[in-house]
Structures are given as C-alpha cells and as structure tokens.
Amino acid sequence: TVLGLVAGGTGNDAAEALGLRVGSLEDRVDRALADPVPVDLIWTGERHAVTSCVAGFPAAVNVRAEAMRFPRGPSRYTLATLAELPGMRPGRYRLTLDGEVVELTAAVVVVANTAFFGGGMRICPDADPTDGLLDVCVVGEVGRLSLLRSFAKVRTGAHLDHPDVSMFRAAAVGIVALDARPGLRADGEPFGSLPCDLVASPGAIQVAGALTAPPGRA
C-alpha cells in the first residue's frame, strides 16, 4: 500500500519533512501520485507514528493548540506555547537509549523520526526518516524565559546551540516519567501515556514522491 499525502492540515509537519508541502495544489497532487519511497516509522508495539513523539511541555502545548478554534495554521502553536508557559515545570525522566540508561531533568523530551514538529519547528533538523534511527532532543532544567528563548530558535534549528539542549540517537528509546507529566503526544494527537518504548521501524511505509533528505538548519 502506498500513501499519497497532500498537505492541508494545521501543522503539516509530515508533509514538510517529506518535501510534500512545496508548490501549488496541482504540484502537490502530482507528487502524491509519484513513485513510492520507503520511509521509517516510530513503533510502540501497538501503534505507529510518522513524525515524533513528545513529552513534557510540548505535549501540554499540543493539547492546548488542539482545543483552540482560532487562529488556523502554525500560529496556533505559538499562542498555545505562550498560554502554557506560566505552568511549565521540568520533570524527571529515565531514558533508555539502545540499552543505555540516562536519568535527567527535562522540560522537553522529543523522540523524532523526522525533523519538524509544532507546525514547522526544526526540533531535530538532522533526523533522517530512512536511517533506522530515532533522534532524541532533550531540553533540560531551564526556566520559563530560557525555554521561551529556545523555542524562538527552534524554527531554524539554532536551539541546538543552547547549553541545556542535548541530542541523542538510538534505534530503541524507552521513556519513564519519574516525577513528570505522563502524557504522550505523537503527530499532534493523543498517544497514550508514559512509560513507553519507542522503536524505529525501517521502511515501514511507502510514501509517494517523498523527499527524505534531512533539511538541516535553516
């Protein structure tokens, strides 16, 4: 089965990451009828995700954004971020990365198959959806103002220069919330709760006309 994707949603992060958001509507339809390209997915043992799974502050932002009726488009996530910021508190997590255990305090944990989340933000700009690996972005024990400044840089990927941002890469990622919010979101939708085990599923889906090279920083 081949997936033909024509961007038309609020965030369009999957389409953006796979090069399917460029051009006119006619161009996008033509791309959705092009030759298939194998693309990795994230697998939990029960469900698949395409772009990323998020815990912590961005999960709360996503819930807020989905409840909003105005505005449409990526600016909804910006307003949701500002609304959730006063209640932001980093939490403790245990991550297992290909068997290696790391305990840390974090405001943000993102496990990504592709580069974009939150309506075009380059949270993991080097994520490659064909390498059989997941990119993990952790924003550590930061204050509200520092987090806001970091999020302002996510559009370009410049947040990776922040000293409290850490990047990991693994084929299998386990997440346990020690004293953090347990909610988990994936592809902008509810995705259960922590703990969870996420595994890269190589070539799990065929996407028509996909361009899979990581975008890198803007």
Where are these regions (language model features)?
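Catalytic core of DAGKc-family lipid kinases
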Residues: 1-107
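Short beta-strand-to-turn element immediately C-terminal to the catalytic PLP-Schiff-base lysine
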Residues: 44, 64, 111, 139-140, ...
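Glycine-rich phosphate/pyrophosphate-binding beta-alpha loops
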Residues: 54, 58, 110-125, 190
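Short acidic/glycine-rich loop or secondary-structure boundary segments that cap or lie
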Residues: 58-61, 103-105, 117-120, 144-148
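Gly/Ser/Thr-rich active-site loops/lids in small-molecule metabolic enzymes
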Residues: 69-76, 125-146
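A generic structural signal for short beta-strands and their flanking turns/coil linkers
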Residues: 89-91, 105-107, 130-135, 169-171
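ATP/nucleoside-binding phosphotransfer catalytic cores, i.e., glycine-rich phosphate-binding loops
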Residues: 97-103, 128, 138-218
